[in-house]
Every structure is written in C-alpha cells, then in structure tokens.
Regions:
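A sequence-level detector for short glycine-anchored, His/Arg-bearing signature motifs
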Residues: 93, 135, 149-152, 156-159, ...
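A short, charged helix-loop
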Residues: 126-155
C-alpha cells in the first residue's frame, strides 16, 4: 500500500494508484507508525524451512550514492539503473506524507562483522514488531537498535568494510579501485 510496484509504473491508472498510496501514507502516519527509531532496526525473518535470515533496516546518505555510469561512490548499484522509471517514482514522492523509497543493500561481509554482532545482542533490544508473513513467507520480527555503542559498532563495521585495505584484500584483481561499501 505504500509503494508503486514496477509492474504498474506505466499503467493508465498510475495517478490513481499514487493517490491511494498517499492516502495509505496518511493513515499509516497517524495509526501505524507510532514510534520513530533513532538508529536501525535489526530484522530476523524465519523461513518455513527454519532458516533465519538477518538484516538491518536503516537510512543511507544519498550523497554517498550515484547510479551514473562510471561513478565510484561508496554506495552504488550492482546493475544499470533504468532512468525511465525515475519520474513515476518521483510522482509518488511529490506530496507524500512519508519517505518510503526502498532498496536492498548488500554488503560483502565474509567475517560477519555488520549484522551478526547485533543479532547476538537482540535480547538487549526493544522488540518493535513480530508476525507471520503472507503466502508462506515465514515469520518476521524487528528490534530497535538505538544504543550508542551498537550504532558505533555498525559505523565501524561499515567503515572497515569500505576501507581500501579490506577492498584490496577481498578483490585483488581490482586492487586500488575505489572501494564499494554497499551495493544496491
């Protein structure tokens, strides 16, 4: 209800869909989103098989991102950006009560230094939500990560993952290239 799926970007009723998204945002702003998290949300999704997938939900500085071909910021896409899809997405953002652009960020973290240490301390975190996902998607739960020490730990892990030394060690064939901290 809060996003315009790509399949509908060029539909004739896209404007109506955007209006519905804005109405849903207004509803969520007053009825659902009752607490802002000043930090990250640690998320665990338990699949039907029992496998637990961990992640962090947070915000990124768009000044550290570029989709331009040849650009080498710390955060960049793993594939070409389809620029024709940007205007319909901007239509959703114009007049929106919430900022809800979303992307999956990927970190090459073989040492498990970013997410897993937070998960090891989830008992110390305040649980924000928990529930079953639809269509056999499993179970999901989220915890607020607001402790200054944990936030510093996340920042340090990201800095280490984005260091030239770590990048050169992981990717000797690209030694000296601008490090990629997060891929979109």
């Amino acid at each position: 209800r809060l996003i315009l799926p790509e399949v509908y970007l060029e539909d004739e009723d896209a404007a109506r869909r955007v209006e519905n998204i804005h109405a849903a945002m207004d509803e969520y702003s007053s009825d659902v989103l009752t607490r802002a998290v000043d930090g990250f949300v640690y998320v665990e999704r338990t699949e039907q098989s029992g496998r637990v997938r961990q992640g962090l939900v947070g915000k990124i500085d768009l000044e550290a991102y570029s989709y331009e071909k040849g650009a080498r910021p710390a955060i960049r896409p793993s594939e070409r950006t389809v620029t024709e899809r940007i205007p319909p997405r901007m239509a959703v953002r114009r007049g929106a009560a919430l900022e809800t652009p979303h992307v999956m960020m990927l970190a090459d973290d073989p040492g498990c230094t970013l997410v897993e240490p937070i998960g090891a301390h989830k008992s110390e975190l305040k649980k924000l939500y928990e529930g079953e996902l639809m269509q056999g998607g499993g179970h999901i739960a989220g915890w607020a990560v607001e402790d200054p020490a944990m936030l510093a730990q996340i920042d340090a892990a990201l800095a280490a993952l984005g260091s030239q030394e770590a990048f050169d060690a992981k990717y000797p064939q690209a030694k000296g290239a601008k490090p990629l901290t997060l891929a979109v």
